[in-house]
Amino acid sequence: MPSTAVTLTQSASAQSIEAIASRSLKSIPLEKQAADQQPSVPIDPLDSPYPVPWNWVMKTYEGVSAREGSGVRYYRSHSLLSPDGEYAAYSRIQMQVQPELYRSQVSSVMFLENLRTGQLQEVKASSPLALHLMTQGKAATPGIISILAPIGWSKASDRLLARQFEGFFSTSDVSDYAVIWHRSQNRTTTLAPAQVYNNHAMSILLGWSQTNPNQVVFRVGDLGDEQWQMWTVAENGQTTLATSVEQPVVFGLRQMQLWAGEQIASR
């Protein structure tokens, strides 16, 4: 039986920056992209096919806490180019290190650049912890992890799909949300399977549904479960058990740049 989850929408704010040079593009299905990345995939708390830079997070905490006690460090992801070559999306991750891991914080900003005009805008998630960080600022609860990063485009380049990974350090309370940016309307939708909202289950974002490209696919379960089921989620929040032939896909080209990775800037 389908069930319904809460969805949240918001518009992206815009600003300007120099354009990134566009390169030739091709479409990459999720299965091939994940396979190509396997040799260098970092550890991900949810074993996602689109991992967050967890090795960097943990090494940064260990290094800064041991040498300085506390500090701020930054990480910049590679760009994800749209199939039509007109947009690039990337994230800048910030880690505020405290002597205790459970008091440290990881947050992020995801940028979307129009490569023809050079216009840059910020895409934001409306998931619970992302909203908490936006509204509370320095008064936010310690230990929050909130990382938004692009994972794929639609085949027509009219929608961008991003993974919002959030939870708390030193706990098993982590999960994924999907953030969809609509090109024609310049708005975003944040959604997750109904089980995440109603039963506090854990979910892993897998990509667009191949059988229904307007929906996204998650793997959902609880810690300790041997079998996690695949569910599709529509933009109105309707959550339905995926069919046996479901195969998640994404499109776009990941642009490998020299300036991606750990950033020198710190304070």
Task: Label the predicted regions.
Residues 2-267:
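Sequence signature of WD/YWTD-type beta-propeller architectures
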